[in-house]
From Swiss-Prot:
GO terms for molecular function: ATP binding; ATP hydrolysis activity. One of its GO terms (biological process) is peptide transport. It comes from Salmonella typhi. Its EC number is 7.4.2.10. It is an enzyme of class 7 (translocase). Belongs to the ABC transporter superfamily. Glutathione importer (TC 3.A.1.5.11) family. This is Glutathione import ATP-binding protein GsiA.
Amino acid sequence: MPHSDELDSRDVLSVSGLNIAFHHEGQQVDAVRNVSLRLKRGETLTIVGESGSGKSVTALALMRLIEQSGANVRCGEMLLRRRNRQVIELSEQSDAQMRRVRGADIAMIFQEPMTSLNPVFTVGEQIAESIRLHQGASHEEALAEAKRMLDQVRIPESQAILSRYPHQLSGGMRQRVMIAMALSCRPAVLIADEPTTALDVTIQAQILQLIKVLQQEMSMGVIFITHDMGVVADIADRVLVMYQGEAVETGSVEQIFHAPTHPYTQTLLAAVPQLGAMRGHSLPRRFPLISADEPALYESQIEQDTVVEGEPILQVRGLVTRFPLRSGLFNRVTREVHAVENISFDLWPGETLSLVGESGSGKSTTGRALLRLVESRQGEIIFNGQRIDTLSAGKLQPLRRDIQCIFQDPYASLDPRQTVGYSIMEPLRIHGLGQGDAAAKRVAWLLERVGLRPEHAWRYPHEFSGGQRQRICIARALALNPKVIIADEAVSALDVSVRGQIINLLLDLQREMGIAYLFISHDMAVVERISHRVAVMYLGQIVEMGPRRAVFENPQHPYTRKLMAAVPVADPSRHRPRRVLLSDDIPSNIHKRGEETPAVSLQLVGPGHYVARPLQDNALSRL
């Protein structure tokens, strides 16, 4: 049915009176109520709001994927102008018609790449499939275009990445693959649902720049869903603010940032962490407290002086972790990924040490090596005076209750067949620390501590938003009262208000229980707030390490300074010229078998502040 007379000539998408409902155990739950929006060619509309506000549900409705989640569009109109200028009503299209529309005319980058990529196909085959389907290219042409797209999203060793599987890539790498796949067919409308959540600030800056360039080339309309107000200020033309399933405010990016009218918008902006807010303070501090009824903020003056002097709870000495890459007729190991190269550090009780760096720098691998989820090539890991890198699985089991983890991808961490209450209770049952009513009460308490309701224990992971799933993972990590928590991007999927609540919770638990955190993150504003010390990683090596104040206020290494310069500012009037932050020749940590990485030498430049000495033949010297 033609609808061209109902869509403005400049619009590529129009949504009017959209209402979406979920059906659960015979009950109807309204997730989105009366949402309307318009998107013009070449325009970027950002949708912001708390986790569970209906942002992602709205996007899934536009892709006609909402039915797979047990929801339906109750009423409303969704008009799309295809690349051939034909205007269609999305809700009237059959499944076969939508398969032709998705990817070619409207594409989506999802928040959790591991659940969006097929684990049994290589990266190259998955990107090439979309190109073959919508562009009619041959297999060879599609693979060549897939490599070009990987180059565009700045994945090093793109030819090698084509033959690798999703589980062999870091979270940030997987997200870049998703972005390459979505942009490969140059759609008329791109929906990006938290596309840079898993990316470090430098790659985030490059990806945002790439989307802008492609948007201008193709006059592509972009709907950008995010909780990062710095990103909103950087890329948005207009902003739609959602709260509890409704659009509460819309306007230009300047109007929203400089003259917000709705109390929720004012509260949302006030809660944004600002890089530099900790200048002059040496110890971690809680985020400002937000009242739901009063946008004014109250900043706690309590500093987190929790570090216990004496012996470190965790010691790492000369850790090396490498992964083999096989190729050739006989599938022999010909190259290796030098993921972690000769790193050493200590972690004291009650301390937060943050690992920062780009995707693929070795941060997550370091955390997994400490948990013995991957085996290290060499080095020592000493926990509470006991060497654990040589322990058998049986002897390691009792120690696991003292070292817990929060992973980057919450959906992959939760069993989809079990209720979240069962998943939280499982560590208690395994370690014999509770069962029956006592365990149920513990689960209810943990859910409340992370901002969820006790009755959520009976729901399944797919019934929660990405941010809510991450809170469930945090509750599970806290169940055993651990001495050390390794948090791998633990708050990256959370909106700003919930992020502040979770960081405050982690700080409270650290003060009450003396927990030590190894905090892996690319969010420099959060790292600045929570850290006692910071270690900067690049290509598997630590290039700068020291007290948080010294590293942030006086960064010595060129790479550290580039990380700081890439952080987006949550103010559209303060755009900083952000050039491409890394050279076009991206160094790679993939080496021939037997080839050794030159070790960096750390120099003491201040109290506890160490910086890598550049080497002539080292990638660090080319930064």
